C-alpha cells in the first residue's frame, strides 16, 4: 500500500514497542500446552513452491489485503491494544521438546492487514486458525464472543523455551521485523523491501501476507521462517534462517517479481531513529543528552574502503547516495555504548542493537542510500538505509537477492584501521580572540588500530587528510588524545557564502602515506545568515 511515511512509521514504531510488554501471569506461563486448531489438510511445501506462488501472484492485478476490522478492534486505543497478550499455553511448539516457541499478535489499532500463518512439519504446511481463546484480552474490554472465528493474525514473535517472557525476534506490520542480541533490547527494525523511499512522492510499504514457520528439530539453534510478500508494485518469496545467539543471525534468501518498473527499490532496508547526538541538535527542552537508536552508517565498499557516516537530524529531508559495486557490507550501528551519554533508564539506548547487512554474493553496481528525515519525536523512525541496484527491476523479471543480517552490540566485520568514536561540532574560532568571520568547528575522535602506539611516540607524524565540497578549512590539526588511546582531528569550516547549501566533508588520518583510520564522511548544512555568530 502507499501512504504518508511519517504516519505509518510513527504508528509502527509505537506499536513495535509492544515487543517489550510485561509477561503473562505465572499461572498462564505454567499452564499445560493446548493444541492449536488448524484449517484444511497439510500440503507439501518448500521454497520452490513459495517462489512459484509469488511469481503467479505478480502476474495478477494487485488486490489490497487490508480489511475492515470489527468495530471494537477499530476503536481500541494504544493502552487497550497493548494489554492484549497471546497465552503461553497456546504457543506454537509449546507441546514439543525443541528450544523455541512462537506466539502471535492480535489484529487491531494500526494493524488491519491479516496474515495467514502456517506450521510446517515434515515438509507439509497447514494453516493455523485464529482462536479468540488463545488471547488474554486484558484491559481491552474485548472478549472472544465479540470477534469472528476467522479473523486472522497480525504477526508473530519468537522466544526460547527457557525464557518465555522475552522474545528475540518479531515480525509485525507491513514487512517490518526486529531482533535482538544478548543485550535483549529492541531498537531499529528491518524490512522485507523499501519502495520509493526518499523520492519525494508517496512511499510504498509492501506487506508480508503469509508466514510459514518450520518446526525446528529438538537440538536445532535455528528457526526457519518463510514469508510471502505482496504490494502494488511487486511480489516476493523470502526464506529466513534465524539463529539465536549473542549476535543474532538471519540468513535471508529472497526472490522478487515486479508487477511494474520500480523507481527506487531498496534491498536490505534498515529503519532507525536519530533525534539528537553529540554532533548536532542539542535540545534545551529534553533532560537527556542523546536520543538515538543508532548513531552512524558504516560501509565496507567493494573496493575495500571502510566508511563511517555519522547520522544527523537534518533541518529538511536529506538524501545521500554512496555509489559502489559488489559491496561487502553496510549497516546502521550504535557505537556509543555509554549509559552516561543517554541517561535513560527506561529505554536504554546504549543497549540498542547494531544491524549489519552482508551480501551473500555479488550485488553488482548500485548504491547504498541513506535517507534522513527531520523529527522532534523519538517514536518516529526517521532514518532509512538500503541497497539500491543500478538496474531498475522490470515486470516479468526474477530478482534473486541473498544476504545476512547480524543483530547485536557489534557488527561481525570491522576495519583493521582505527574507527571513529565521536563527532562533535560547534562554533569555530580561537577562544579569547575576536572572530573576524563565521566558522564551524568539527572535532572527530578516532581510536583503535595503530593509534594507541602512535599516541605514545613523540616522533610520530600523524596528519589529517581533509576535503570539502565547498568553502575553506582552517586550524586543521591531528593530535594524540590519551584519554581515548587515540587521536582527535579538529578543523574549522568556513562556508563560502551566506547560503545554506549542504557541504560534503571527507576526512581520515594517515602517517607516512598510509591510512590509519576509516574514512569519516559528513554532510553539514550551514546556519542561516541570521543565526551565525562572529
UniProtKB/Swiss-Prot annotation:
Q: How is it modified after translation?
A: Predicted to be exported by the Tat system. The position of the signal peptide cleavage has not been experimentally proven.
- Cellular localization per UniProt: Periplasm
Q: What is this protein called?
A: Glucans biosynthesis protein D
The root-end lineage is: Bacteria, Pseudomonadati, Pseudomonadota, Gammaproteobacteria, Lysobacterales
Principal location: periplasm
Xref: PROSITE patterns? TAT
Swiss-Prot/TrEMBL keywords:
Periplasm, Signal
Q: Give the Gene Ontology MF terms in alphabetical order.
A: carbohydrate binding; catalytic activity
Q: Which family does it belong to?
A: Belongs to the OpgD/OpgG family.
Concerning Pfam families, the annotation shows: MdoG
Secretion signal: which residues?
1-30
What is this protein's function per UniProt? Probably involved in the control of the structural glucose backbone of osmoregulated periplasmic glucans (OPGs).
Gene of this entry? opgD
Which pathway does it serve?
Answer: Glycan metabolism; osmoregulated periplasmic glucan (OPG) biosynthesis
Question: Mind listing the GO biological process terms from this record?
Answer: beta-glucan biosynthetic process
Amino acid at each position: 500500500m502507499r501512504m504518508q511515511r511519517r504516519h505509518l512509521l510513527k504508528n509502527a514504531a509505537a506499536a513495535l514497542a509492544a515487543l517489550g510488554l510485561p509477561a503473562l501471569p505465572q499461572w498462564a506461563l505454567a499452564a499445560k500446552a493446548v493444541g492449536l486448531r488448524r484449517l484444511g489438510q497439510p500440503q507439501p511445501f518448500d521454497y520452490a513452491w513459495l517462489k512459484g506462488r509469488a511469481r503467479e501472484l505478480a502476474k495478477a492485478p494487485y488486490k489490497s489485503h487490508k480489511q475492515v476490522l470489527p468495530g471494537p478492534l477499530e476503536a481500541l486505543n494504544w493502552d487497550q491494544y497493548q494489554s492484549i497478550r497471546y497465552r503461553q499455553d497456546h504457543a506454537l511448539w509449546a507441546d514439543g521438546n525443541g528450544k523455541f516457541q512462537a506466539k502471535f499478535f492480535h489484529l487491531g489499532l494500526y494493524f488491519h492487514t491479516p496474515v495467514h500463518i502456517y506450521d510446517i512439519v515434515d515438509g507439509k504446511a497447514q494453516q493455523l486458525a485464529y482462536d479468540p481463546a488463545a488471547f488474554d484480552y486484558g484491559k481491552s474490554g474485548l472478549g472472544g464472543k465479540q470477534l469472528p472465528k476467522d479473523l486472522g493474525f497480525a504477526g508473530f514473535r519468537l522466544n526460547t523455551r527457557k525464557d518465555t517472557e522475552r522474545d528475540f525476534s518479531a515480525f509485525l506490520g507491513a514487512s517490518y521485523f526486529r531482533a535482538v542480541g544478548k543485550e535483549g533490547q529492541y531498537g531499529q527494525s528491518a524490512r522485507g523491501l523499501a519502495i520509493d523511499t526518499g523520492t519525494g512522492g508517496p512511499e510504498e510499504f509492501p506487506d508480508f501476507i503469509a508466514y510459514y514457520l518450520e518446526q525446528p528439530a529438538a537440538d536445532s539453534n535455528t528457526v526457519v521462517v518463510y514469508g510471502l510478500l505482496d504490494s502494488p508494485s511487486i511480489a516476493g518469496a523470502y526464506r529466513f534462517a534465524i539463529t539465536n545467539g549473542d549476535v543474532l543471525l538471519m540468513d535471508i534468501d529472497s526472490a522478487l517479481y515486479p508487477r511494474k518498473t520500480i523507481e527506487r527499490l531498496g534491498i536490505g532496508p534498515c529503519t532507525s531513529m536519530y533525534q539528537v547526538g553529540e554532533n548536532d541538535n542539542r535540545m534545551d527542552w529534553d533532560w537527556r543528552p542523546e536520543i538515538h537508536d543508532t548513531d552512524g552508517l558504516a560501509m565496507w565498499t567493494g573496493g575495500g574502503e571502510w566508511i563511517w557516516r555519522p547520522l544527523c537530524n537534518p533541518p529538511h529531508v536529506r538524501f545521500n547516495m554512496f555509489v559502489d559495486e559488489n559491496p561487502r557490507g553496510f549497516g546502521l550501528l550504535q557505537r556509543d555504548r555509554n549509559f552516561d551519554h543517554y541517561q535513560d533508564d527506561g529505554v536504554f539506548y546504549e543497549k540498542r542493537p547494531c544491524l549489519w547487512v552482508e551480501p551473500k554474493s555479488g550485488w553488482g553496481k548500485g548504491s547504498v542510500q541513506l535517507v534522513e528525515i527531520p523529527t522532534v519525536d523519538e517514536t518516529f523512525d526517521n532514518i532509512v538505509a538500503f541497497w539500491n541496484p543500478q538496474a531498475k527491476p522490470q515486470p516479468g523479471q526474477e530478482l534473486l537477492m541473498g544476504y545476512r543480517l547480524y543483530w547485536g552490540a557489534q557488527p561481525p566485520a570491522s576495519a583493521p584501521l582505527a574507527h571513529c568514536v565521536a563527532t562533535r561540532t560547534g562554533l569555530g574560532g580561537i577562544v579569547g580572540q575576536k572572530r573576524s568571520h563565521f566558522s564551524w568547528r568539527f572535532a572527530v575522535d578516532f581510536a583503535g588500530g595503530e593509534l594507541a602506539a602512535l599516541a605514545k611516540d613523540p616522533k610520530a607524524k600523524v596528519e589529517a587528510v581533509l576535503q570539502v565540497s565547498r568553502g575553506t578549512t582552517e586550524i586543521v590539526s591531528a593530535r594524540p588524545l590519551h584519554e581515548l588511546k587515540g587521536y582527535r582531528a579538529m578543523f574549522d569550516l568556513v562556508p563560502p557564502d551566506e547560503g545554506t547549501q549542504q557541504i560534503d566533508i571527507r576526512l581520515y588520518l594517515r602517517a607516512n602515506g598510509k591510512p590509519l583510520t576509516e574514512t569519516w564522511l559528513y554532510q553539514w548544512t550551514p546556519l542561516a545568515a541570521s543565526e551565525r555568530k562572529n
